[in-house]
Amino acid sequence: NAINEMIENGMQGVEFIAVNTDAQDLKHSKAKSKIQIGLNLTKGLGAGAKLDIGQAAADESLNEIVNVLQGANMVFITAGMGGGTGTGSAHVIARAAKELNILTVGVVTLPFLYEGPSRMRRATQGLEELRKHVDTIIVVPNQNLFKIASEQTTFEELSLIHISEP
């Protein structure tokens, strides 16, 4: 998780807020602030790669999201595009931040090609929606990780490269 990596690296002057539909994922987050979105909708489970569930979960928890955003000068929204929660909720959170006149930056990843065309279509759809609500966006295609990996790099090592790359 990118948030855990930034916390472990001692990033200062930042308040980290983990947002997820999945209760188990939130338990592993080192962020001091955590928001489990869509509790009534998902019952603490993930969004099942359904971006409409991710969006509905964020909508359900919008008041809580707005409360933690208030007072911020700048918000970075990090998400992996292509699944349900990040893809569906990122633009809802970004829209809320923009409505509060907060400078909003998206930092997202696109799926590996081997993850298939349907995941890439969801990612593209989520990315297009997110672009409407951020001041700027940084998009990192996961496929680019192969440029810095060797044939001997394991999937676990590749995941660590992914997390620790700026």
Regions inferred by a protein language model and the residue ranges of each:
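Tubulin/FtsZ superfamily GTPase core signature
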Residues: 1-166
